[in-house]
């Protein structure tokens, strides 16, 4: 029996492993040598066929796709730029419009800081509040003029109700130690004096103020395209009016000049000022109904825009539009109440 030394086995094993590795290398080399020509041939065929990822055709296609994407991006960016410019212009335009209208409404000669301090807002935004409405005989540029018509309005936006109380312009009041007609208070102390005088007379706290002169009333009426009212009786006055001297009874649309005649004429009636005050309330009621019947906040905004130069008030543009919008749907036949302060005429000092 013979034996093989251990180191001989290791050598044999190493020899065997070495042989296997050599064989594997030879096989791999042979395979590589055998496939190299095929790979080269295939690559050559692809290039010649124009399908290589680096071919001119594909490069041109890629370039065209990039140009299309770039053009789309440029179009989108251009549109966004246009929209942004339009938006900015619109915002600026609205801002200028708002400031212009606001400046016309809040005439600083009338709406003074003293007046704003006298006006008193309601305790809660939902509470009813009082507005003093004046029709004046003032002319553009004048600062001293009288109140020709005086109406205290109670506005209840939540319940969509308005109450208008006419105060006779000849009502006697004690003002700063002297007795005078209430309409003369405006001549001496302007809007602020009138608000204080009416507060004391009626025991209220007025929240807002608005006035319009004769020309303004006619202008507002024309801006609305006329106002439809029911003229209850024939009226004629040729001594105090020239443009319009008479109106016949019946439902009719009054233009500016006719509206001025309807709301100012008094010598044609036996009770003089009382009928005139009733006509004034009737006209304002009809005007409110006509404005609210549009049912459109945009239309209300347009009306504010077209009449701002004819009205003076402490209210802002947004306040007026908001109030008008709140009152849309109001039943103007039932929910606008009108009355006048009971009084009797007395001749004083001759």
Where are these regions (language model features)?
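Non-catalytic, solvent-exposed segments at the cell envelope interface
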Residues: 2-14, 36, 40-42, 46-350
């Amino acid at each position: 029996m013979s034996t093989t030394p251990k180191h001989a086995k290791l050598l044999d094993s190493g020899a065997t492993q070495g042989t296997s590795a050599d064989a594997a290398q030879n096989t791999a080399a042979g395979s590589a040598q055998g496939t190299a020509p095929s790979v080269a041939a295939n690559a050559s065929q692809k290039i010649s066929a124009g399908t290589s990822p680096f071919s001119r055709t594909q490069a041109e296609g890629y370039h065209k796709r990039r140009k299309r994407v770039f053009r789309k991006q440029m179009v989108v960016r251009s549109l966004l730029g246009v929209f942004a410019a339009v938006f900015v212009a619109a915002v600026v335009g609205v801002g200028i419009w708002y400031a212009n209208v606001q400046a016309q409404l809040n005439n600083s000669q009338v709406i003074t800081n003293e007046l704003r301090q006298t006006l008193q807002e309601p305790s809660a935004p939902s509470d009813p509040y009082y507005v003093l409405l004046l029709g004046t005989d003032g002319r553009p540029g004048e600062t001293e003029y009288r109140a020709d018509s005086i109406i205290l309005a109670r506005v209840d936006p939540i319940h969509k109700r308005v109450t208008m109380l006419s105060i006779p312009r000849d009502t006697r009041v004690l003002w700063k130690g002297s007795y005078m007609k209430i309409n003369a208070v405006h001549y001496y102390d302007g809007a602020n004096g009138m608000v204080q005088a009416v507060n004391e007379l009626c025991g209220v706290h007025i929240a807002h103020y608005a006035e319009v002169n004769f020309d303004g009333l006619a202008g507002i009426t024309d801006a609305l395209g006329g106002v439809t009212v029911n003229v209850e009786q024939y009226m004629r006055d040729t001594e105090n009016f020239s443009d319009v001297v008479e109106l016949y009874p019946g439902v009719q649309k009054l233009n500016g000049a006719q509206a001025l005649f309807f709301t100012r004429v008094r010598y044609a009636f036996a009770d003089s000022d009382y009928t005139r005050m009733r006509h004034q309330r009737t006209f304002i009621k009809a005007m409110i109904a006509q404005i609210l019947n549009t049912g459109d906040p945009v239309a209300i905004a347009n009306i504010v825009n077209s009449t701002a130069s004819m009205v003076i008030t402490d209210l802002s543009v947004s306040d007026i539009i908001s109030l008008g919008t709140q009152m849309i749907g109001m039943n103007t036949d039932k929910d606008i109440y009108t009355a006048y302060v009971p009084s009797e005429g007395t001749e004083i000092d001759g």
